[in-house]
Amino acid sequence: MQIKKNIAISESGYIFNPSSGESFSINPTGVEIFNFIKEGKTYEEIEQLVLEKYNTDKDTFDKDYHDFIGFLKQYHLLDYGEKEN
């Protein structure tokens, strides 16, 4: 799973999908996770990085991560290549 190549994101969390013309705003943690996915990091790598940085537990991270992935899927921002996380 990866972010589609044509999707643009600003440092402030503004996402633009040129294919649909839609734009979205995400919070700073969402920006980090978005960029980790764009870099090709695995779920496990992202989990470790987020748990080290933020005061949260694995269950909360897991729920929030999958909610975020659901958002990305809903707005067709993901591209599925070799494998899905």
Question: How does the language model describe each region?
Answer:
Residues 25-85:
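Long, charge-rich, low-complexity alpha-helical segments
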Residues 1-31, 35, 81:
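Acidic, low-complexity/disordered tracts enriched in E/D and polar residues
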